[in-house]
């Protein structure tokens, strides 16, 4: 891959990597025709050669692989809740870019094949702003992976040395950020077929020396797994909006501003087999509540069955073992 933090990152140029991926995928499928393979996209949306890298890669292996593997971790500075909860817009921009790129390659090859996407790493987090170094460009020599720090402490996987596993910013805020991303995946289910939540256990539970307990994300993801089935239905929302100014977390993670971000985020799934229309709604406004009116005139004969709500008076609250029911 192309990340300068990766050992051997420039051993293969994008064409060389694409050729290797093509030949490897062919051999694997000759051994087992049921195997599906994925080829890696660029390591970050902030790389100066994104998305040119994956364009060159796909030109070599489009016919033999099944997925373009993507990954991204959205970051927002402490206290900027709207930037954290608006992170799904950058994911959708990422998805639209890669899907369009895949379709361009298909058109150039006159191929009927439609490449699918897989998110093999994703997440959202609060990160303190780091010192910026103007003029050095992306991935400059101030980055930690170019330096040796003899005083850097190693992570000890020892119960008596266990680090704090609580989420920065609180369980509820972490859950809302992740669910907003997952709803974006649901809206793009025609192309995004796999999404691996990298910090799975870390996101779904918290722990201390003596206890492990379910965090807010556990309940939200459980409901998505149960109810986000069938056919993804596009939603149209009329609500108040806000603007997100651009910001830089560090020399690498720099986000353009976004205008007219809807305060209400939504996705829907029609479970035809069980005769259910399931609607998922999230409020990005930490200062106001909203009344929701749903127009489902296309589903005559359906009736309201039930709703689940996750709510807290304090978005920054962090749970402990005593909170789990």
Question: Predicted regions: what is each one?
Answer:
Residues 1-35, 41-43, 47-55, 76-91, ...:
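Active-site cleft segment of glycoside hydrolase catalytic domains centered on the general acid/base Glu
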Residues 2-6, 44-49, 74-80, 123-129, ...:
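Flexible loop/turn segments at secondary-structure boundaries
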Residues 24-27, 31, 56, 60, ...:
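Generic, well-ordered alpha-helical scaffold segments in large soluble proteins
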Residues 25-48, 95, 99-123, 194-198:
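Aromatic-lined carbohydrate-recognition surfaces of secreted/lumenal glycan-active proteins
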Residues 42-69, 122-138, 204:
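Substrate-binding cleft/loops of secretory-pathway carbohydrate-active enzymes
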Residues 119-264:
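Aromatic/acidic polysaccharide-binding cleft in carbohydrate-active enzymes
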Residues 259-301, 307-310:
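Carbohydrate-binding surface patches
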Residues 317-323:
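Conserved small/polar residues in nucleotide/adenosyl-binding loops
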